[in-house]
Design a protein with these regions (language model features):
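N-terminal, charge-rich interaction modules
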Residues: 1-76, 86, 93, 151-154, ...
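A domain-level signal for the structural core that forms small-molecule/cofactor-binding pockets
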Residues: 54-55, 96, 114, 130, ...
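Short glycine-rich or small-residue beta-strand-to-loop segments that form or flank ligand, phosphate
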Residues: 66-72, 97-99, 125-131
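Gly/Ser/Thr-rich loops at beta-strand to alpha-helix junctions
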Residues: 72-79, 131-139, 162
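Long, charge-dense
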Residues: 81-120, 158-163
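Short, non-transmembrane amphipathic alpha-helical segments
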Residues: 82-90, 140-149
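Short acidic, glycine/serine/threonine-rich loops at helix termini
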Residues: 108, 139-141, 167-170
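Extended, charge-rich low-complexity interaction segments
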Residues: 118-142
Length: 170
């Protein structure tokens, strides 16, 4: 190579668009509402006591937060108990999910991914970034692929300098 020739960044000149899943990672405040705290002897949900406890609960601590409603105790919880908790949370909370904090995070992540406009990637070569600071669930990569496959020219996984081909339009 002649030292007088300018260096050309072939990656930058390739027209590849990098989509970083971390950009869609949920940053909102989350909370967990655990029904185990309302069980009699850690096993039984008494309707009258439960209704009274929810009526006296300070729901403002969930204001603007996304909430996972779960029961971490090994108990049989009637469906109406989750419904009743949701009826109190709905006016103050953001998203409400039946499940643990991971389920809530998954729902929020997928909701954020759904804001991607596929038209922005029409006939483009897309690399879905695979390495980062934040652990990203496999479901995110699958959803991005599902969303972009109908429009993208190609989809790759990794970094622009080292990719694994996923899809290429014929």
């Amino acid at each position: 190579m002649n030292m007088s020739e300018p260096l050309i960044n072939k990656v930058a000149a390739s027209g590849i668009i990098t989509l970083n899943p971390e950009d869609y990672y949920p940053k909102e405040e989350m909370a967990v509402f655990d029904l185990k705290d309302y069980l009699f002897m850690g096993l039984i949900l008494k309707e009258k006591d439960f209704r009274e406890a929810l009526k006296n609960q300070d729901w403002d601590k969930y204001k603007g937060r996304h909430v996972a409603v779960t029961c971490s105790a090994d108990a049989i919880i009637p469906v109406w108990a989750y419904m009743l908790a949701a009826s109190y949370l709905e006016p103050v909370a953001g998203e409400i999910v039946m499940g643990d904090e991971k389920e809530l995070q998954k729902k929020l992540f997928l909701k954020n991914i759904s804001t991607i406009d596929p038209a922005d990637f029409a006939d483009k070569r897309v690399v879905v970034k695979g390495c980062g600071e934040t652990p990203i669930g496999d479901y995110v990569y699958m959803e991005i692929t599902r969303l972009l496959r109908p429009v993208a020219k190609s989809i790759m996984y990794g970094e622009p300098c080292s990719t694994v081909p996923i899809f290429k339009k014929k």
